């Protein structure tokens, strides 16, 4: 059985309403994209947490609806356009989508990832390329962090070089648990992972069990009192700035902190906020992202 995609380009003010109408009329799924994506006219839309976007769609939006074979695209679009009160049906394309083994297709897109000097992130359906390496078995899932994003890679490389056996580590914004698991495999103990998303916490627990890594996970209100030898936070620049005092207070005097989720152009601004508490600078840059690292001063 093959499916069809209905692709419609239209102005910003109608994109959301058309999406809702298509779903109500039986579309299996609907997505809205920037019609100018991958061109010089591409427009960033959503900001970081704590910042309110000023638009809900792009000036030139592309609405893509997945339809079952029993839906006639032109008829469905005409009905949707009528429902939202648009007088003229916009131009559209129809693309055939062949049925596939989606599980196998998805798995084929994720290969083992080498990171740093001896780390491999390996999906469960692959064998480890080097059995003697430091292996993290992780599958793509609901929580962020499989080693493919530059910020995750930067933090992993920093942890590999920085963690010493027996040190305590806090991974704030743990996502999949990848950084906490790596810290534990590097010899850190105890290791704590904190995230605001209960699904991420559960995912991280499962990943730790799969990797035989003893890590304590919880929501922010479960973050233990006291200080850690190492604190790592791979979030985004705005939350990092808002939490600077709290995160810095979790680092022992003389302890170390690493921050990522920060674009190179945001590095100075984030560093300036943390400079009250730690001596911090850009440790490494990769693909436009940076990892900031520093040491908490003994006087604070």
UniProtKB/Swiss-Prot annotation:
Its main location: cytoplasm. It catalyses: L-lysyl-[protein] + 3 S-adenosyl-L-methionine = N(6),N(6),N(6)-trimethyl-L-lysyl-[protein] + 3 S-adenosyl-L-homocysteine + 3 H(+). The keyword Methyltransferase applies. InterPro entries: Ribosomal_L11_MeTrfase_PrmA, Ribosomal_PrmA_MeTrfase, SAM-dependent_MTases_sf. It is found in: Cytoplasm. GO terms for biological process: methylation. Its EC number is 2.1.1.-. GO terms for cellular component: cytosol. Keywords: Cytoplasm, Methyltransferase, S-adenosyl-L-methionine, Transferase. Belongs to the methyltransferase superfamily. PrmA family. This is Ribosomal protein L11 methyltransferase. The gene is prmA.
